[in-house]
């Protein structure tokens, strides 16, 4: 297969491709969340779950306490669109004063600290920001380390590994949802093409981990089936490893 061909290039170069899994928009304990956590447990693939602080429930925390393979990232503040009419959806955009947006993010961090304070979450709640709709005003990024963030994760190629000192950016590259086409599965062909393209780019241009992005609340059967078969197949392929967000976002000094 084309995927095997790409992984052969990695092996020929004596390198190991890194993949990671991010799922967005967690707010409550739902049947879809249960299905997601079951998939994580069955496959053993580490999952980074982006949680919306202003909407996250105690029930969510209770359910995640028993899911040690899941780390918690901060998904904006309230997942509210503040873009002007006709603009692309964005919560962390330039429409509002930076202090207001940064204040919201800091409030969100405190909310997650309270919600995920139990010993079960030690080392699992990460100071990583996932902007809603994967968009953030560039002017806000330099202030993120000042309010406690050590990581940033959006979608697509990154401009640089560390947009500002003390902030590591690791994105997702394979979105399984066809948002423009009504929210179903993009289909196996497109998903695999995105994955192979991102792996090739990581091999030849920017040595980053490649991220697969899921959205448990909107996934149809085709998406669930693809994700399960992908993780089951990939976990046994040589030349590739699944990485936990804890490893990816650890400081370079800590990883050496």
Where on the chain are the PLM-derived regions?
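A conserved mid-domain beta-alpha-beta active-site/ligand-binding segment of alpha/beta enzyme cores
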Residues: 169-217, 222
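Active-site beta->alpha N-cap acidic-glycine motif
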Residues: 1-71, 114, 121, 125, ...
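A cross-domain feature marking catalytic cores of carbohydrate-active enzymes
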Residues: 23-25, 49-53, 74-76, 130-133, ...
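Alpha-helical scaffolding within the catalytic cores
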Residues: 3-6, 56-65, 153-167, 189-201
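Catalytic domains of cell-wall/extracellular-matrix polysaccharide-remodeling enzymes
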Residues: 96-175, 219-226
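Surface-exposed, active-site-proximal loop segments in enzymatic domains
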Residues: 83-95
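Acidic-and-aromatic substrate-binding clefts and catalytic sites of carbohydrate-active enzymes
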Residues: 25-31, 50-61, 84, 128-139, ...
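C-terminal domain-boundary segment and adjacent tail
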Residues: 11-14, 151-156, 204-256
